[in-house]
């Protein structure tokens, strides 16, 4: 979301919108608010709604779980607790967050149930993952236990966190690349809301208090009533609205036994002031072009990093940095941190995110439809880019996927036969404020990584499912289960250049504050060219990062050839750090 006013001194829990400036009232009559209706993930043939349905069902299937019997030490003040949870939701990109008390009338007489949950729950109980990612066994065991346990009583839940996710604008008439996303605005926002509510409910349970997520497709409570009671929406007699969200929104909530501080409901007189509504980055740009002016970058035929492609060897998944740590190649200290995924589980926010990340592994590579639909490569690329940006990806690039970009063997040692020759690289922005506030070796750093990895796993998985529905093979390569080397593909697709800080690809608009993911496919696509924005000349002359690096990991020397690539290498003695 673009910045509306300076937030240098604005606390994160206050959110990006100045809702504190809106008039409030002490209480509100909820009897006039219409009952919530379930959102069905149904749409015309070819719509992205169908591809989103399975991922929405997965989030609905894991919305509840086992509560940690040991309660953590948290602030005793309900206001401090509320601010913490609001900040977490804002960090997860919730547009608005509100809190209200949960009243008996807020419970649905007939709870809403996603009809696809039963199928997903059976998959969680019976399917086996192929990945050996650290801690995947613990995640899958937890998920199996959760879906095998019937939902318990929630009458002891006294409070609700309510989230609103702004809907993007509707595609313009004849806008290129938008055939898949027409009519999917609410479904897209509901999916993102489901992600946040599922993560925060799990987070509260990890702290030792019972909590359950409620979405537009599966809910035990009336989200419309909660939205009005928490100040997230106003019922104007016709529609639920918020003064700052002119395109509408989708709702999600977390009910909990944890005591929180309720917000005051909005007064019916609340109106939009000039310049305060959400500014849509796509108001004057097509979805296929992205929010950033990528079209202004200088395009070149070859990446600025030399690649000796005939001599680039394929390496096994066992050579992956996380695998090396897990198997003890980098010393006993790092092996201990990697055991069971402890480096993620030691912080509750990242542990909460990793649960959903593990669940999506089962959805990464679905079978293609039996009938293949012909789509021109240029049209297919526009459809994929527009859909990805519409869903919330921050940057998308398309390139060939050479055989040397694939691992030679998977985590189990089985040979990998490259099935796809096309790569769709995607980037999730980790956020300037988050990067600025983290030391890189704290719980913030882990949570910001897991947030970005989870977001790609969700959105990349949806795009892969859409391609599979057209009859082409596709796979989302995530941090939990990937079979390709991503940095070279980012270079080929024009995301950025290699800098002195190592193998991280630096983007001219996002810098290094990004996490990437790749969807590979055999669907013919039009490719993007690599870019050259002067990074190589700049890094050769600057050396400031090498001088200031506290661990000495960044070297000041020239590039060296390694595995067929010309790179500036990280100091080997500092790799365990």
Kindly give the residue locations of the regions a language model identified.
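Auxiliary alpha/beta "docking" domains used to position bulky ligands
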Residues: 1-536
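Single conserved hydrophobic/aromatic residue that forms the stacking wall/gate
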Residues: 568-577
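Local cysteine-cluster metal-coordination motifs and their immediate loop/turn environment
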Residues: 270, 537-555, 571
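Active/binding-pocket-proximal capping segment
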Residues: 536, 554-567
């Amino acid at each position: 979301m673009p910045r509306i006013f300076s937030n240098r001194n604005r606390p994160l829990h206050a959110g990006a919108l100045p809702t504190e400036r809106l008039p409030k009232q002490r209480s509100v009559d909820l009897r006039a608010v219409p009952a919530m209706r379930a959102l069905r993930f149904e749409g015309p043939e070819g719509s992205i709604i169908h591809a989103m349905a399975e991922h929405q069902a997965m989030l609905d299937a894991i919305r509840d779980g086992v509560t940690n019997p040991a309660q953590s030490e948290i602030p005793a003040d309900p206001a401090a607790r509320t601010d913490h949870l609001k900040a977490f939701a804002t960090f997860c990109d919730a547009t608005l967050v509100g809190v209200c008390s949960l009243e008996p009338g807020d419970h649905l007489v007939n709870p809403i149930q996603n009809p696809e949950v039963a199928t997903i729950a059976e998959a969680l109980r019976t399917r086996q993952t192929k990945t050996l990612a650290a801690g995947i066994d613990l995640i899958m065991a937890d998920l199996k236990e959760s879906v095998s346990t019937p939902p318990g009583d929630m009458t002891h839940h006294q409070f609700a966190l309510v989230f609103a996710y702004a809907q993007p604008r509707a595609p313009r008439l004849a806008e290129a690349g938008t055939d898949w996303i027409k009519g999917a605005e609410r479904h897209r926002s509901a999916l993102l809301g489901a992600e946040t509510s599922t993560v925060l409910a799990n987070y509260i349970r990890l702290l030792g208090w019972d909590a359950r997520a409620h979405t537009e497709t599966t809910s035990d409570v009336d989200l419309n009533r909660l939205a009005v009671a928490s100040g997230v929406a106003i019922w104007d007699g016709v529609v639920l609205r918020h003064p700052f969200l002119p395109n509408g929104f989708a709702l999600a909530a977390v009910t909990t036994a944890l005591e929180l501080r309720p917000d005051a409901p909005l007064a019916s007189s609340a109106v939009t002031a000039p310049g305060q509504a959400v500014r849509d980055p796509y108001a004057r740009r097509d979805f296929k072009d992205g929010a950033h002016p990528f079209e202004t970058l200088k395009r070149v035929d070859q990446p600025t990093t030399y690649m000796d492609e005939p001599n680039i060897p394929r390496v096994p998944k066992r050579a992956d940095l996380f695998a090396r740590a897990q198997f003890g190649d980098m010393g006993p200290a790092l092996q201990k941190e990697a055991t069971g995924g402890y480096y993620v589980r030691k912080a509750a926010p990242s542990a909460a995110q990793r649960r959903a990340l593990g669940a999506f592994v089962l959805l990464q590579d679905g079978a293609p439809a039996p009938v293949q639909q012909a789509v021109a490569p240029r049209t297919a690329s526009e459809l994929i880019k527009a859909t990805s940006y519409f869903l919330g990806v921050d940057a998308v690039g398309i390139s060939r996927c050479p055989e040397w970009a694939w691992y030679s063997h998977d985590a189990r040692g089985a040979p990998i036969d490259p099935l796809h020759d096309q790569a769709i690289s995607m980037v999730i922005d980790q956020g300037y404020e988050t990067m600025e506030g983290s030391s890189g070796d704290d719980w913030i750093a882990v949570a910001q990584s897991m947030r970005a990895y989870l977001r790609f796993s969700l959105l990349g998985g949806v795009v892969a499912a859409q391609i599979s529905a057209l009859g082409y093979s596709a796979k989302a390569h995530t941090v939990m289960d990937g079979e390709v080397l991503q940095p070279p593909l980012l270079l080929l697709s024009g995301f950025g250049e290699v800098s002195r800080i190592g193998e991280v690809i630096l983007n001219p608009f996002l810098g290094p504050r990004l996490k990437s993911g790749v969807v590979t496919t055999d669907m013919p696509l039009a490719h993007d060219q690599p870019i050259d924005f002067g990074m190589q000349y700049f890094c050769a002359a600057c050396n400031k990062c090498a001088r200031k690096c506290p661990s000495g990991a960044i070297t000041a020397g020239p590039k060296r050839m390694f595995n067929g690539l010309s790179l500036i290498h990280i100091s080997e003695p500092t790799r365990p750090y």
